[in-house]
Amino acid sequence: MSTIEKAGRPMLLGKRRETLGSMYSLVGSHSAVKLCRWQKSMMRGRGGCYKWTMYGIESHRCMEATPSMACANKCVFCWRLNTNPTATKWRWQVDEPQIIVEGMLSSHKALVSGVRGMPGVTEKGLEEAMNPRHCALSLVGEAVLYPYVNDFLHVLHGKGISTFLVNNGQFPDALKELRPVTQLYLSVDAPNKETMKFLDRPVFPDYWDRFNQSVVNMSEKKERTVFRLTMINGFNMSEENIPEYQGIFETGRPNFIELKRLTPAFSGNTRTVLRIKNVPSWEQLKAYAKRLCEVIFDGKEYEVATLHEHSGCILLAQKRFKINGIWHTWIDFEHFNAMVLDPILSARIVADGYLRPTPSWALPESEGEGFDPAQTRHVTAKRQKYLASKPAGEE
């Protein structure tokens, strides 16, 4: 790393740093970590997030982070309230990967320590949470924008930490050069150019071309790939959108497709055009997932494999992950980490080379609709009142 790169101005200064520092635990000059509610929930035995149900990621052992607070979009549905910088290229001081990772782990431990004493938190759960085994690079910003993202990933893998990297499809060249991660995501926020401009508010004028090139680049990746959709009533989940999604999915051929309904986090964001009416019901989401399965490759390629009603997420998987009638959407993390650290084995990584069977409680027909029966679901008094006010069978 050159002296010039180290001497550049920091990404976050003054009021912006103060504002973001109140929302995240900032690491160095451009990175951050944060505890999510599911981490605390699983520490208390109250259930994990959809990534536990679908992939076997223990929520309390997952560190949510980013090596770049900057992003090329200002999405209207972003529940981070768009306080982070926008950028089309890196123009700031660059922190070293090793220092970033060490800072993240230190900050994460400090955040977890703050949960000690919370009702239901056990010492075992707390100790496990202190030593994360997974890193969700989806906190905020665009991870692939960080110039040394591959070195950063290598440091994480070297510590036995699996990597789940989300990208918005605006940096196709960086995506193409990205080395294998445990699971690679592309956000598909809209099925067409006009809707993407409205929902994502991209800063690149050629955003649609960049996105489509990223779809092609994703199709060339050998590790597990996921196309991630935030479903918004009235914007991106009409019947007319189905053939548009079909074109994207048949080009990108992702191993998995996540349909996650809009998170109704509108409090404090008076400028958003979104309202509760834009949050699809669970039944609407399931119906849309079924339609996509029927249409993509004429129904020959994908099925609903798992779901998690609690967080409003449904996973479509390529049928090749259903081995001898049993879904294998879970991940063998130890096997992946052993491969990715070996220069020879790393080149041989393939999506179906590090699988584990999906537990029966995670399947679509499960009684708990993806909620782990070993956990205890906690329903707040406010939620109980809301459910009691709804007609039977309606959310």
For each predicted feature, which ranges?
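Conserved alpha-helical substructure of the radical SAM core
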Residues: 70, 81-139, 147
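Short Gly/Ser/Thr- and Asp/Glu-enriched loop/turn motifs at secondary-structure junctions
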Residues: 60, 130-132, 308-312
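Structured loops at beta-to-helix junctions and adjacent beta-edge loops in soluble globular domains
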Residues: 38, 68, 140, 230, ...
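Flexible, acidic/Gly-rich N-terminal and inter-domain linker regions that tether
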Residues: 1-69, 73-77, 81-107, 387-395
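Conserved AdoMet/S-adenosylmethionine-binding subsite of the radical SAM
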Residues: 117-291
